[in-house]
Amino acid sequence: MLADYISRAIQNHTDCNVICDHYQKDELSEVIRRVRKWQFRDGIELMCSEEIETAVQTGNEQCPEQWIVWTVTGDKAKTVSPQHKEFFSLCQQGYWLKMQLA
């Protein structure tokens, strides 16, 4: 289940290793991009792509917009369902994980 892998990656669980962590700040477009990739002991590879706007926030937002895309990659990708999940904020991601792992 994808939610289980996402949760373990976020928590830096001992059964997964970060194999890529690329951070890029584009001053012209005011966007921060981050791509991370994990490999789990069972051979599953998980990639997270994030985009965060660096424009000044109003402070009224409890959960600012942040594009988050999780994708299962590698040879064993078909064993995980769903293989792809997108969120528009950390709050939405947190709620989805909470509901999936309940």
What residues fall within each predicted segment?
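Cysteine-centric segments in proteins
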Residues: 1-102
